[in-house]
Amino acid sequence: MKYSVPVAFLLLALLSFGQNPPADAEQKELTAALSEAGNSPLEFARVLEQHLTKYPNSPQRDELISALVKASIEVADKRRILAWGEKSLAQNMDQPQVLERVARILLEVDDKDRSERALKYARKYEESLRALAGSAPDNPTQKAKFLEEHDRAVGRSLSLQARAVGNLGKTEEAIALARKSFEIYPGHEPAREAAKWLAKSGKGIEAARFFADAFVAPDSPAEMRAKDRAMMAESYRKEKGSEAGLGDLVLEAHDRAVGIGVKRLARLREVDPNTGVTNPTEYTISSLEGGKLKLASLKGKVIVMDFWATWCGPCRVQHPLYEEVKKKFADSEDVVFLGINTDEDSTLVKPFLESNQWGTKTVYFEDGLSNLLRVSSIPTTIVFDKQGQVFSRMNGFIPERFVDQLTARIAEAKGQ
């Protein structure tokens, strides 16, 4: 979330019209300070911190602290996240992002009190996430992304708990939590956490295996790989006396990572068949009637995609011109026209088409395709040649030239 002048004004509006507005002098001072903060979230946080220090009993204290914490998260200001994040959580624990950031910062220091606080926040973080499990959106693309991020977040919450209980001397519980985290979302963090506590408990080979998992994890930062490699070798040598066979351990970890990735992708594609697809002509899109069209089935044909929406005025102007071009190629079996609707609310589409007497036969929903093709404005018309490459892209249109231009582009693509 970006903090800018408009956001500052929203905060000021809250202060002005809230149930407990601050005194005029306080509000004037805050208004002036926020105006000077400009577009910088760092300055925004500094202003709010100074204001709260001067006015610790401000009627809008909770709202100001919440805004301060969000701005601090934006710029990764650990001091302010910790100092004000715990104050914010004391008023409202239902803040997953704040719970995670505060717990993570607390665990940067191996201290009993900090670990106990971090454990409390990490457990609440997990609880908040699991409460959200049933709120996945209906849209397949959004649902797949939600499930992926939800699993990743739950895994993070368990890794944080593992670190906290480990710091508190509960090694076996830490190992169990780290293993559970890795099962939910295999990645470098839970693998490294499990390896650390396994090594501490004297289970060198198991530790080496998890260090290998961290080493080969696709999401592992480059700067951590060398450390994982060293720890893996150290744990292995303690058990085996040398590094002979260590390469096999790494290969096994690689094969596990590949297998895990394949299974996860298959699971997500049950929800959204386009998960992980990077070639637009390999996409599967939904028809207005609920059917599915695999664009790969159109291989060898020229594909014309018209991206539009019910709320788009220029799209209505372009539509009869687009239909005129379609008629020119009505007898061309190697040209396919697809209307790609981009409305967020798909229930608006059919009534719109019926009331405007537009055809429904070749209308499909974008299902994430517009994002892949970076369609940022509509109408946009994209022509793919018979090899599946983008041959022409028309962002917007010039009414008096559109028919001739699109006709020429399609004819040229047919001849390729």
Language model: regions and residue ranges:
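N-terminal leader/linker segments that initiate helical-solenoid repeat arrays
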Residues: 18-64
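N-proximal helix/coil linker or "cap" segments that precede and/or mark the start of modular domains
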Residues: 223-282, 296-299
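Thiol-/selenol-based redox modules, centered on thioredoxin-like
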Residues: 386-416
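Conserved helix-turn-beta segment immediately C-terminal to the redox Cys motif
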Residues: 319-340
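TPR/TPR-like (Sel1-like) alpha-helical repeat modules
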Residues: 120-130, 204-222, 250-255
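A short beta-strand-turn-helix
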Residues: 284-303, 329
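Conserved redox-active cysteine motifs that mediate thiol-disulfide chemistry
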Residues: 307-324
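Short, internal strand/loop/helix patches
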Residues: 284, 350-387
